[in-house]
Amino acid sequence: MMKTLGAVLSLSLTLLSFGGAHAATMSFKNNCPYTVWPASFGNPQLSTTGFELASQASFQLDTPVPWSGRFWARTRCSTDASGKFVCETADCDSGQLMCNGKTGIPPATLAEFTIAAGGGQDFYDVSLVDGFNLPMSVTPQGGTGTCKMGSCAANVNLVCPSELQKIGSDGSVVACLSACVKFGEPQYCCTPPQETKEKCPPTNYSQIFHEQCPDAYSYAFDDNKGLFTCSGGPNYLITFCP
């Protein structure tokens, strides 16, 4: 998770009380023409950390409040001859459907949340900081304030530079690495000595992500465009291939 939202998560969980706690319902809808295998990682861990979602299917999962974490969808999953569950994109390397506290291996499109207690201000985004593997959107349901949709509706794989492409078993581009994940250099990861927004402007690579998905995080300091808020205890709809 990018540094900016990570700081928000930590601060929010420190300041928010548990008074008036209620469950926030996450509804998942798969509009992709193929099955996906969503997964979760967060604090505290949710009742399920992985499930199968067929094309056009829906699923609901409650989070406690406060809660911080992320969701993503694995693609091209199967069980190998040894009985190990594996996925071509965003695999969490648990060897099974449940990720059990493990995060997805980049590249992966992420939906990230800080859910506040007592109807306070939630923070959420769709992030490409770890790369892209499928289109995704996050839509608040109810709530007060701006409550805008975060989204990456475009198929970034179609414009992914060759050096960032992840190639699947059939030879097609199945995901697109971020420049940070691919090269690990400060100019792309906004790490020392380029750890501030002033020292770490967008790069040509992050601009590709931003042009395709202007309502998603394209790199670590994209919070002015990619980070959204909603108050009053909303629920959320997470759509794959919106």
Swiss-Prot record:
Disulfide bonds join C32-C241, C77-C87, C92-C99, C147-C230, C152-C213, C160-C176, C180-C189, C190-C200. Residues 1-23 form the signal peptide. One of its GO terms (cellular component) is extracellular region. Induction: Up-regulated in the abscission zone following treatment with propylene and in both the abscission zone and surrounding tissues after wounding due to embryoctomy. InterPro entries: Osmotin/thaumatin-like_sf, Thaumatin, Thaumatin_CS. Preferentially expressed in the abscission zone of fruit. Also expressed in leaf abscission zone. It comes from the Eukaryota. Keywords: Disulfide bond, Plant defense, Secreted, Signal. Transmembrane segments: none annotated. Gene3D superfamilies: Thaumatin (2.60.110.10). Coiled coil: none annotated. GO terms for biological process: defense response. Pfam families: Thaumatin. It is found in: Secreted. May be involved in protecting plant tissues from pathogen infection. Belongs to the thaumatin family. This is Thaumatin-like protein 2.
